Every structure is written in structure tokens, then in C-alpha cells.
Design a protein with these regions (language model features):
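Hydrophobic alpha-helical membrane segments
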Residues: 1-275
């Protein structure tokens, strides 16, 4: 599997397929709205400076849950678009329509898809406990350190401020250590289950669906020996992800269809290799 050729094919398809942008219109709009409605960095800094670690943990949990809900809704539309692309690549449909972005909400797909996504995310959450705990500690201590530094007159730190920063630095180191360990543990699992949504679609069409856990097991089997390939595909999009961040999501008009077209092509090529 050549990832460079895969990405080049995805870019070519973006130019050649009419209606591709329309297929991803809803998730792009949701992403833009969520970016504009999110908390500012200044507000977060002031809040973290006035609370203890327990309160910061509750805030991060609530923000994380809100983010998960938004991501879940976005994922339903993106999965719908991906299913339409699968049919297009297999010549089971001739053109894309806006209604294809709602495929996941059909009676046949919605319940199995929600169950599969729920099981997948629950399993990944369990694998990511260290990552979540480390993230909360790192974010909390980082904002505390920044707040202390910004409150210093003319950026001249007093001995007390230096001591406070030193104490928080130890917590920051612990948080970053937990994040690193969490990533080492959770990333292989994330990629092991990365093909579950596509496998579910094929099982539903073939009449072989036997429940979400069977879908997840099939994804683990399919990804044996290819988790590194999928990881490198994601790494190749880091520059595009940074561009999306810098443009508050506006670059997603191009980037989101590009990334997910590549993901569908990856699945199609992987499925062919595994036959």
C-alpha cells in the first residue's frame, strides 16, 4: 500500500467528483459553529487560576463530554458521506447527492451504527484513562503557571511566584508523563478499531452483522500489520490539521473531504489486500 499514491488519488477524486463538498457540508458547518462558540483562552486561564484541581477536573470532564457529543454528531454525518463514497468507488451508485449525507440516519443503519460507536468509544475511553488524567493535570498546571507569569508586574517574578511555578512544574511534568504513557497504551487500540464503521456497512449490506463486538473484533483482525500504515496516513495530515486550527476550521472546506476520502480509499485497498 503506497500512501503517497493514495493521497494523490484522493486529491484527484476531489477535483473529479461533483457534489463531494456538498456531501461534507453539514459536518463542516457544525465544526465551524463549535469553533466560534467555544471558550476563549483568556476565559479558561482566569477560570483555572481561581479553582483547585478537583474543580478543574470537573470542568475538563464537562468540556470533554460536550466535545464528545459534538464529535459524535459530526461523525454520523462523516460516516454517512463515507458510505456514499464506498458505493461510488464500487460503482454501486453513479452520483453523490446531499441526501447521502444522511445515510447513517436510515432505519437499517442508525441503531447498529450507534451501538458500534458507543462500544468502540467506551473501549477506547478505558484504554485512555491515563491520557485523560494526564491531560487534566497538564492543562490545569499550564494555565496556573501562565496566570502567575502574566500577573507579575513587568514580568518580574517574585521569589514566591518562582516557588509557585516550581511546584506547578513538578505537577506539569507528572501530567506530561501520564499523557505520554497514555498515548503509548491507547494509540495502538485506536488504530486497531479504526475500520469498524466501514466493516459495519459491509456487514449490513451482506447480511452478516452479528452485533457491535463482532464488528470491533473484525476491525482488530483486519488491522493486524497495518496499524502503522494508518498511523502514518494520519501523520501525513498534521500540516492540514494545523491549517484548520489556524483558520478556525475554515480550511476544513478542503481538508475534511480530503482526509475522509483518503480514509475510504485506505479501507478499500486494505480490504482488497486482506482477501
Amino acid at each position: 500500500m503506497n500512501l503517497r499514491q493514495l493521497r494523490a488519488e484522493a486529491r484527484l477524486l476531489q477535483r473529479k467528483i461533483p457534489g463531494l463538498l456538498l456531501l461534507f457540508f453539514i459536518p463542516i458547518m457544525i465544526l465551524l459553529l463549535s469553533n466560534f462558540l467555544g471558550d476563549s483562552q483568556e476565559d479558561l486561564m482566569e477560570y483555572f487560576a481561581s479553582v483547585d484541581l478537583k474543580q478543574a477536573f470537573y470542568l475538563e470532564v464537562s468540556r470533554g463530554l460536550f466535545s464528545q457529543v459534538i464529535n459524535f454528531v459530526i461523525s454520523l454525518f462523516i460516516i454517512s458521506a463515507s458510505y456514499a463514497l464506498i458505493d461510488l468507488f464500487r460503482r454501486q451508485t453513479e452520483q453523490l447527492k446531499f441526501s447521502d449525507s444522511l445515510r447513517a440516519f436510515s432505519n437499517q443503519i442508525f441503531t447498529p451504527l450507534v451501538l458500534t460507536l458507543f462500544c468502540k468509544r467506551l473501549i477506547l475511553f478505558c484504554w485512555s484513562i491515563l491520557l485523560w488524567v494526564g491531560s487534566v493535570i497538564s492543562i490545569f498546571t499550564s494555565y496556573r503557571i501562565l496566570y502567575i507569569y502574566n500577573q507579575a508586574p513587568n514580568n518580574q517574578l517574585s521569589d514566591q511566584a518562582i516557588q509557585q511555578i516550581s511546584n506547578y512544574s513538578l505537577s506539569l511534568f507528572l501530567g506530561l508523563l501520564l499523557v505520554t504513557l497514555g498515548l503509548i497504551i491507547s494509540l495502538p487500540q485506536r488504530y486497531a478499531y479504526s475500520q469498524a464503521e466501514f466493516i459495519l456497512y459491509d456487514q449490513l449490506k451482506e447480511g452478516t452483522y452479528q452485533g457491535p463486538l463482532q464488528v470491533l473484533r473484525q476491525s482488530r483482525l483486519m488491522m493486524k500489520g497495518y496499524k502503522d500504515k494508518r498511523f502514518m496516513l494520519d501523520v501525513s495530515f498534521i500540516g492540514w490539521q494545523i491549517l484548520m486550527f489556524l483558520t478556525l476550521g475554515l480550511a476544513g472546506i478542503y481538508v475534511i473531504p480530503y482526509i475522509h476520502t483518503s480514509s475510504v480509499l485506505f479501507y478499500e485497498q486494505l480490504k482488497a489486500l486482506k482477501k
